[in-house]
Amino acid sequence: MSTEAEPRVLREVVLSQLATGESRAYKMWLPPLTDPTPVNELVERDYQRRPLRFGLGIMDEPRRHRQEVWGVDVSAAGGNIAVGGAPQTGKSTFLQTLVVSAAATHTPRQVQFYCVDLGGGGLMYLEDLPHVGGVATRAEPDRVNRVVAEVKAVLRAREQVFKQYRVGSIASYREMRDDPSNPASQDPFGDVFLVIDGWPAFVAEFPDLEPAVQDIAGQGLAYGVHVIITTPRWTELKSRVRDYLGTKIEFRLGDVNETQIDRITREIPANRPGRAVSLEKHHLMMGVPRLDGVHSADNIVEAISSAVQQIAGRHTDQAPQVRVLPERIYLHQLDPNPPGPDSDYRTRWQVPLGVRESDLTVAYNQMHLTPHLLIFGAPKSGKTRIAHAVAQAICKRNSPQQVRFMLADYRSGLLDAVPQSHLLDAGAINRNSATLEEAIKALAVNLKKRLPPPDLTTAQLRARSWWSGPDVVLLVDDWHMVTAAAGMVSPMAPLGPLLPAAADIGLHVIVTCQMSMAHRATMDKFVGAAYGAGSPTLFLSGEKNDFPSRDIIVKKRPPGQAFLVGPDGKEVIQAAYVDPPEEEVFSPPSEGS
């Protein structure tokens, strides 16, 4: 039997030798973008990685025969991001990837995220990241307001810091924050991101917040404050906001003619979530928010939870959390150390009303300048409790020689609101129209004597030296009941001509009224005069049609929450509260008595 090898042709010899070589032929055609890349691989493969650049996906560049990590550098003009795409194309997952990528490469001191989730709830899975200061959903309207207010407060505070320390750019400010000896290092906020998933729903449900977001988008980049917005249609994003969003990412659109980038978006395959097009007109496959190396969106909730735990384990610091308005704020919490009767007039008549939603500081009524207060609200909205709190605050600041009260209290809702020592000696408590009318006439006669003579100097007017005696507070609970019982002539008519001079003669008017009667009350000669003079007005819970107005937001609110309109502007507050007096319980007489 022959052992000689069968002869081989030259081709076979060459091919066998080439197959064992280390060099391979150049691959002109790279694999299609089908599977998403996890964040941990995006971070490892991103050769452009640097501070404030987030690796977000894989970009296909067919002309250069390359597929490399695509990301966004938020330190530059593209620091605001708009994401467009039809439902179920991967927009919310993209936001998750962005936040996880940023958290994987930055500390909670460097970047913070404040999220409004009006999409499918995907951002809530990121709430435990130390880089996330808060996530608000459509079921938490007060929290949504606070998220936007918190970010806007950061912007306003940073504007003041830039002015104070003459900071020329946000790049310089970042360096200042990194210097422990610099006062800017005390700023707990780094680059702050307001993330809104579902812009059309945001505008529809929170129309009053749209100008605030526009303001942040327009001014924020210069101060390290960013906006990221998703929308299913570009037409939903009005130009006054869209033009401020320098980076645009486009997933598959419902109507490709709406593209903001290029008709190349029509080439994005259907039913392929995560596929998108960048401003560079390159196809992208966005990553997935996981750190386990799996190229899939399967079991993504568990993967996100694991990634959050892994990142949280690396850090001990935490992004400042969103603070929310308390459901109830007691007067003693709001005003723990009120100024006493020895204080000057201006200080004594700076009366706390509640806590501002914008920055959680105390809102005051400067009653030395704007001597009146109007309170409108639906039943059980807190009108009378607020009147109690304001009356108590005034009494704590002023002695009986400095202030006296007259009450119109048809419903006996003001029991114990004012101590006996601070009531007028005569006509102080009025529970029907007859006694109120007589008391008002007597009060008007006395107050007319305080009207300033025409020859007073400016100094005398300021000091109110031409009369002496206590200021008088007319506290009217349930104005609608007073007017209904009065008939044709209001019992307040004698005081009407005195209201323009109220600050000069020491007259203060506090009125509560049903929201359904608010519009009518502001047309009244008495309450309307106070309202028209710019008196601070609280609009508590009510129906929108109770007080039709473009400028005033009337809606259903929790008890004590109000829309405050005053000389300093408009804002939401949680008004001060005091407990109602304890009711005496009378036991039935015993059988033997």
UniProtKB/Swiss-Prot annotation:
Alphabetized PROSITE patterns for the sequence: FTSK
Entry-linked PANTHER family: SPORULATION PROTEIN RELATED, TYPE VII SECRETION SYSTEM PROTEIN ESSC
Primary location class: cytoplasm
Entry's Gene Ontology molecular function annotations: ATP binding; ATP hydrolysis activity; DNA binding
Name of the protein: ESX-1 secretion system protein EccCb1
Gene: eccCb1
Record domain FtsK: where: 66-260, 350-546
Disruption-associated phenotype: Loss of DNA conjugation when disrupted in recipient strain, strain does not secrete EsxB.
Protein purpose: Part of the ESX-1 / type VII specialized secretion system (T7SS), which exports several proteins including EsxA and EsxB. Plays a role in DNA conjugation, in both donor and recipient strains.
Alphabetically ordered keywords of this record: ATP-binding, Cytoplasm, Nucleotide-binding, Repeat, Transport
